[in-house]
Every structure is written in structure tokens, then in C-alpha cells.
């Protein structure tokens, strides 16, 4: 979400497991881990059943391949595998190559991106025009304590809340005159 709210992961998983027992039906927990990537949060280690992520972002790292990842528990593996097979979901060899290429530098890139994101977030917090920076690793974030309990780092994506509401014209003017940043697809890729 653009608000980057992180719940108490342990409480959420336990609540879902309790509900599953009460209703007598197994509830499968699926977690989109695109923001934190595979380095900063491991959903399966926190009791989730299936992890999905857009590998186009951090894994590939160059916005030059469309790739998604699914990791799952042994319990859900057969169903996930069959779903992918029956829907014809698979990646081509060149796309896999680009993903493997990106893995070589992913840790270095994500570490640098996290450090840079923290620096930018701290700078944004000091700007008069900004009411709030929505980035869980910030101590000022309402999600900070939950982030700190479960995550070991953070993604490079954040949002801001402005003090004033601006017109579409004013926002377009601001975006059109940016020199360091630009609007882009795939989290600012090409």
C-alpha cells in the first residue's frame, strides 16, 4: 500500500491460525514481499504459507525483465506448482538469466538503497511542506515498532503526506519541473 502500514506480523499470523481452527477450514496466508525483498523479510519464517514478489524490482534490479517469484511451504507446494502449471505461468530462459544476473549484486544494491532511502526520509521529515513521511524504518512511523520486530532492513520506496492539498495543475507543474526525480514505471525504472 502507499501508506506502508506494517501490522504486528506475529499477532496477525496467530489470529489467522486461530480463526482457521475456529471455522474448521485451513486459511492459506499469502504475503506480497516486494517492498522488503528477500533480504529484509522472510515471510515463511514468520508462519506464512506463500510469499510472492515482483522480482522485476530488487532481484532483477535493472527494470529490463518482467519476473515474479513464489516461495511456499512444503504444505502448499503441490497446489502452487499445479496452479502455475495449469495457468501456463513460467519464465523464459532469458528472463531467468537476467534474474540470476541481478542476484549477484542484489545485496549490495539493496543495502545502498536502504541507506539512501533513510537519508532521503530524514531529509524529507525536515521539510516544512511535508506533514508526514510514510516509511516504516523511521522512528516517527506508526509502523516502526512492528517493522523493527520482523524486518532487518527496508525497501527504497516511501510516500509523503503534504500539509496542504494541491490542485492537479500545481502537482503537474511540480512534477514537470523536477530535475533529480522523474515519474517512472516499475518503481522509477525506465
Per-region residue spans from a language model:
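Conserved C-terminal alpha-helix-loop-beta "cap" of PLP-dependent enzymes
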Residues: 132-190
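Conserved PLP-enzyme active-site core in the AAT-like
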Residues: 1-129, 134
